[in-house]
Amino acid sequence: MTKSHEAVTHWYPASVAAKRPTPWWYWGRAVYVSRRDYWKITKYFLAVGIPLGAIGVMFRLPLAFWASVALAEIGLLLLAYSLFGLYRMYGHPGARYVRRLVELGSLKGKVTVADLHIGTYRHAFLLSDVLPEATIQTVDCWNVEGESPEEAVQDVRDLEAPPTSNPRIVAYKADHFTLPLPDASCDAVCFGFGTHEIPTGGAREKLFSEANRILRPGGKVLLFEHGWDAHNYVIFGPVIHHVTKRQDWDKFLRERFDDVKYARSTQAVDLFAGTRR
């Protein structure tokens, strides 16, 4: 069993099961769950900038004063770029990389897609938009012992309820990474943001084995994730260091699937598609 989670009161509004959240809501939630990282980075800037400014004023050192001003400007510029980057990933432009991912996997028509995630149903909605004839079986796969290494995961889970607004989207819950779906019942499985939070050394391997089990012969595996690179570092800050590297995802997928393809979206999202053996 997972460790019990104490109820937390959030000042960001939670979703309603019977109503699809807007792209603005998803962007706002991404900003909200990143608040700890923003504050941590802000403290570093303040710890350097305030003393510099004080030294410049007290000792009449223009260089120190203007260095503090420049530091503040850099901080504001990085914040603005981060907020814009999050919007491109989680706001309205996010549909573009999901569409490109579906094209990379050559999916179309009346397919059945398993959306495997850790508590956000955003991916299911986007898949239903890009594949208007598809049935989306969205499965909450989060079942990790103890606390998440990233507090944002629990925030994400607290704020979004399983959807009931779209008849083509059916929500399920995995049991210790065992999927409640029959063998060879899906044309594709999709893993999205947050998959890197599922630990290696057992849990991740089991979940991808389950994905293979529910895929029909020739079925597709799709994956979109944050990369470990300079672009994502500017958007997310040092927290990006704990995500899985592109090379590691590529190796992991090639060990389990055939014809693995890779593409990079303009929103700094890594895209992978492969075929069941």
Residue positions per predicted region:
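A short acidic, Gly/Pro-enriched loop at the edge of an enzyme's catalytic core
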Residues: 177-189
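Core SAM-dependent methyltransferase catalytic element
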Residues: 258-277
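Class I SAM-dependent methyltransferase Rossmann-like catalytic core
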Residues: 28-47, 57-106
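Class I SAM-dependent methyltransferase SAM/SAH-binding core
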Residues: 120-178
